[in-house]
Amino acid sequence: MNSSCEKIFGVLRSPRVSEKSSRLQEISNVYVFEVSSDATKIDVKNAVERLFDVKVGVVRVLNVKGKSKSFRNRGGSRSGWRKAYVRLIDGQSIDVASSV
């Protein structure tokens, strides 16, 4: 693999499939991805455009805080992660299930 492919797969970790993401995908053409913690909006936009051959309109990125959990009276927490909402230009779509 060349370095550009490694960078793309380093930025996009996986698509997030949930009820909310499915609803956003159907209604407003928005796709949700888990991305690396140091990825910027520009990195995410370039990675999605190159990997799926689509045009991206808007990218919104947010950090999800890890949940506090306890097990047998011992405290701990899950790791936090970063999520990106990617809106495509009208008329374009991604088949997330078969592409990644």
From Swiss-Prot:
Pfam families membership: Ribosomal_L23
Swiss-Prot/TrEMBL GO biological process terms = translation
Keywords attached to this Swiss-Prot or TrEMBL record, sorted alphabetically, are:
Ribonucleoprotein, Ribosomal protein, RNA-binding, rRNA-binding
Quick one: a GO cellular component term?
Answer: ribonucleoprotein complex
Q: Name one GO molecular function term.
A: rRNA binding
Q: Which domain of life is it from?
A: Bacteria
User: Which SUPFAM superfamilies does the entry link to?
Assistant: Ribosomal proteins S24e, L23 and L15e
Q: Which NCBIfam families match?
A: PRK05738.1-3, PRK05738.2-4
Q: Which function does this protein serve?
A: One of the early assembly proteins it binds 23S rRNA. One of the proteins that surrounds the polypeptide exit tunnel on the outside of the ribosome. Forms the main docking site for trigger factor binding to the ribosome.
What family does this belong to?
Belongs to the universal ribosomal protein uL23 family.
Q: How does it assemble?
A: Part of the 50S ribosomal subunit. Contacts protein L29, and trigger factor when it is bound to the ribosome.
Q: Which PANTHER family match?
A: 60S RIBOSOMAL PROTEIN L23A
Q: What is the official name of this protein in its record?
A: Large ribosomal subunit protein uL23
Task: Name the source organism.
Answer: Xylella fastidiosa (strain Temecula1 / ATCC 700964)
